[in-house]
Amino acid sequence: SSGTLTQTEDCPSNVFATLNPLDVDTGSSNTFSNGNLSLVTNGNGSRSTLAANSGKFYAEVKMSTNGVMNGVQDMSKRITANTGTVLLLPSGATLYVAGSTTSYGSAWSANDIMQIAMDLDSATKKVYFGKDGQWWNGSAFANATPHTGTTLSDDTFYGFRCDSGVATPTSDWNFGNGFFGTTAISSEGSNASGIGKFEYDVPAGYTALSTKG
């Protein structure tokens, strides 16, 4: 049997980021699938194959089981490092910034779609989090544009990062190919850059993390 193929937007002129099965911590128990876009982890997770030190980048991740921490990390650090790391644990409504924790909204549900936008162009580099089409503004997910972001360190390369907040959570990333695992996005959002297909509107000025972006 030939099976069912999943369409990809990758081509010789542009390749989107995936999770990197080689960029993991010793002893981690990770299972990658769907072109390294789906991950079941019982360790320190994984990071994106691509990173940048300038530009504005957007990605989505669907948490098939709640308990995944997602965000961004300084790629010059070890994956286990707290420095240069910003992760959101939706199930516990907790934001981890360089190892310190703070409450962040209310708990999410399994199959919610997390939106992550990192701005590496502004004078103060920042990362923003949204859920199911609404951006967090410090008190609620109720705005069409990201703001009140978490500050990142300057002059370094950042990539996207996922980790386990509980035992063996599952996450399906969409870096622009338009799928969560083997399920296509249900309604493509707007994307002025024209690079990548996402469930929700890509914020103005942002694009997919890819070799063209």
Task: Annotate each predicted stretch with a short phrase.
Residues 1-213:
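PRY/SPRY (B30.2) beta-sandwich protein-interaction domains
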